Curated annotation (Swiss-Prot):
Pfam families: TAF, TAF6_C
Protein name as catalogued: Transcription initiation factor TFIID subunit 6
Chief subcellular location: nucleus
UniProt-recorded Gene Ontology molecular function terms: aryl hydrocarbon receptor binding; DNA binding; protein heterodimerization activity; RNA polymerase II general transcription initiation factor activity; transcription coactivator activity
Length: 678
């Protein structure tokens, strides 16, 4: 049976009727049966031949599925024009459908809700296409610009700075002195023999690279000139652009020696001249260089650290120390020193320990002026909580007595008094957070006074504030908030006062509004001279599901005291299937006495609440609305309003803040109810 089936498949040919159909479509009415049979055999052979060639292409492509491209290649191999049209990269999953005697294959597309398309915000406008030219090479050298890759990566700069012997140097060959030193330094021929000395004198002479002057190109010299002039110039816009270029340009590796020398010499000259502005500009240059991710400043720290520390502990940085704010420069430079210690301090260079020793030595000295004392404390405090705990807290009592002797003693110098005040503020600022972590609550001023002296009460108050601020920040971190950036439309219905019963009104909010805020304001005449009875409070609640919306009709009744008449105003509210925001508006305005009717009236306050469905989008059952409290409970403390009746207002802006006048002139007499957190 298997052999017969294979034989049947191998002799499969097209039916002769198909040839007749093709001939009739071409205008040939009568064709003989023998001719149809010959054409059928020929077409079947050609189709099988093309299929075999296509299978060969499939096998050569190491694929398991035959594609249309294989058929095209087979047709091209036979010099047959291939089929033209659109080709899909993936197989299209067609679905089959039949009905009415017809068979149809179609591509199933995903159904898209029209409301989703309408409510989807428009995408951002794409940027315009622009072309920018830059130099790939100038005289055979690649320029160091942001468009080109950096000439030396940061890892290579670090390797050259920390391990210069391991980096490949030009002029040193494989059989040079480095290789001889590495192989012959620890070589031993046998037991009992002494180690051979390094063959430095026996081998070939050293090939020393001649000292060359590192010259900058004309473009780099021009860039250096423009950058330095802009950084210390008078134009703030150019200075900002220059600092941004220093912080982001990847091609400044060759100009780092010039920049470090410029900063070092600039600080040395301007400290003598007490030029505070230029010192600030130079420190901003240091900050920009440290922010550049492509630069490694290890080889230039020996020039930058003295310049920065000079701006911290210098006795005088400006011409008028009692007026100019040189304290901000000392704080900024202290943060720079802390950043340098964080990035470049190792167990080999001990940068942080040496800087800490310098600051401590200047602070402990009794003859140190208050400006230098402030800078030393700021530099130590910026190094971290461990430094504060170890070096600053044990000396708080002595420093507090020194500060008290200046502030409470006879006035010797206004500069000393200002400096002592700044030192006291600095100590309270940095020590309070550390003490809040070290000491358990509660905080007692007597205990602080006994441990820290005159600074104890002030430290206690600052520690209490630090604890409260930390607790507030923890609450803000743990609280989940939802920020809604879409505009909130407000729909307000105002009715004019009528002597007779009010007519029913219908209020509907369209479902296309994303987050509606519904506000119903009941208008009445001016307040009567006698005190009005407590108003009636109505709460309208509705729940919505993903399939349909829930409508509730609530009759609002107002009755004048002492009369038997009752006014009924049913309001029907349609809530869309989204989560609206609860909005409460209650206003009251006194009309002129000439237009106010004599009869008393009542006031209504409406709260519209819509609860989201429990399993929205997941097929879960909708949530049930909360029970509506009776209208007679919880009288409202807010009054009504006299508005221009018969006008419907719809706005796209958020509702006004409490206490602001509305567009129709009415003002709220009491605070609105707080909006619940979403």
């Amino acid at each position: 049976m298997a052999e017969e089936k294979k034989l049947k498949l191998s002799n499969t040919v097209l039916p002769s009727e198909s040839m007749k159909v093709v001939a009739e479509s071409m205008g040939i009415a009568q064709i003989q049966e023998e001719t149809c049979q010959l054409l059928t055999d020929e077409v079947s052979y050609r189709i099988k031949e093309i299929a075999q060639d296509a299978l060969k292409f499939m096998h050569m492509g190491k694929r398991q599925k035959l594609t249309t491209s294989d058929i095209d290649y087979a047709l091209k191999l036979k010099n047959v024009e291939p089929l033209y049209g659109f080709h899909a990269q993936e197989f299209i999953p067609f679905r089959f459908a039949s009905g009415g005697g017809r068979e149809l294959y179609f591509y199933e597309e995903k159904e898209v809700d029209l409301s989703d398309i309408i409510n989807t915000p428009l995408p951002r406008v794409p940027l315009d296409v622009c072309l920018k030219a830059h130099w790939l090479s100038i005289e055979g050298c690649q320029p160091a610009i942001p468009e080109n890759p950096p000439p030396a990566p940061k890892e290579q700069q670090k390797a050259e700075a920390t391990e210069p012997l391991k980096s490949a140097k030009p002029g040193q060959e494989e059989d040079g002195p480095l290789k001889g030193k590495g192989q012959g330094a620890a070589a031993a021929d046998g037991k009992g023999k002494e180690k051979k000395a390094p063959p430095l004198l026996e081998g070939a002479p050293f090939r020393l690279k001649p000292r060359s002057i590192h010259e900058l190109s004309v473009e780099q010299q021009l860039y250096y000139k423009e950058i330095t002039e802009a950084c210390v110039g008078s134009c703030e816009a150019k200075r900002a652009e220059a600092l941004q270029s220093i912080a982001t340009d990847p091609g400044l590796y060759q100009m780092l020696p010039r920049f470090s020398t410029f900063i070092s010499e600039g600080v040395r000259v301007n400290v003598v001249q007490n030029n505070l502005a230029l010192l600030i500009y130079l420190m901003r240059m240091v900050k920009a260089l440290m922010d550049n991710p492509t630069l490694y400043l290890e080889k230039y720290v020996h020039e930058l650290i003295p310049a920065v520390m000079t701006c911290i502990v210098s006795r005088q940085l400006c011409l008028r120390p009692d007026v100019d704010n040189h304290w901000a420069l000392r704080d900024f430079a202290a943060r720079l020193v802390a950043q340098i210690c964080k990035h470049f301090s190792t167990t080999t260079n001990n940068i942080q320990s040496r800087i800490t020793k310098t600051f401590t030595k200047s602070w402990v000295d009794e003859k140190t002026p208050w400006t230098t004392r402030y800078g030393s404390i700021a530099g130590l405090a910026e190094l971290g909580h461990d430094v504060i705990k170890t070096l600053i807290l044990p000396r708080l009592q002595q420093e507090g007595e020194r500060i008290r002797s200046v502030l409470d003693g006879p006035v010797l110098s206004n500069i000393d008094r200002i400096g002592a005040d700044h030192v006291q503020s600095l100590l309270l600022k940095h020590c309070a957070p550390v003490l809040a972590k070290l000491r358990p609550p509660p905080d007692n001023q007597d205990a602080y006074r006994g441990e820290f002296g005159s600074l104890g009460p002030l430290l206690c108050s600052h520690v209490v504030k630090a604890r409260a601020q930390a607790a507030l920040q923890a609450q803000q971190v743990n609280r989940t908030t939802l920020t809604i950036t879409q505009p909130r439309p407000t729909l307000t219905l105002s009715q004019a006062p009528q002597p007779g019963p009010r007519t029913p009104g219908l209020l509907k909010v369209p479902g296309s509004i994303a987050l509606p805020v519904q506000t119903l304001v009941s208008a009445r005449a001016a307040a009567p001279p006698q005190p009005s009875p407590p108003p009636t409070k109505f709460i309208v609640m509705s729940s919505s599901s993903s399939a349909s919306s829930t409508q509730q009709v609530l009759s609002l009744s107002t009755s004048a005291p002492g009369s038997g008449s009752t006014t009924t105003s049913p309001v029907t509210t349609t809530v869309p299937s989204v989560q609206p925001i609860v909005k409460l508006v209650s206003t009251a305005t006194t009309a002129p006495p000439s237009t106010a009717p004599a009869g008393p009236g009542s006031v209504q306050k409406y709260i519209v609440v819509s609860l989201p469905p429990t399993g929205e989008g997941k097929g879960g059952p909708p949530s049930h609305p909360s029970p509506v409290p009776p209208s007679s409970s919880s009288p409202s403390p807010l009054g009504g309003s006299a508005l221009c009746g018969g006008k419907q207002e719809t706005g796209d802006s958020p509702p006004p803040a409490p206490g602001t006048p509305k567009a129709n002139g009415s003002q709220p007499t009491g605070p609105s109810s707080p909006q619940p957190a979403l």
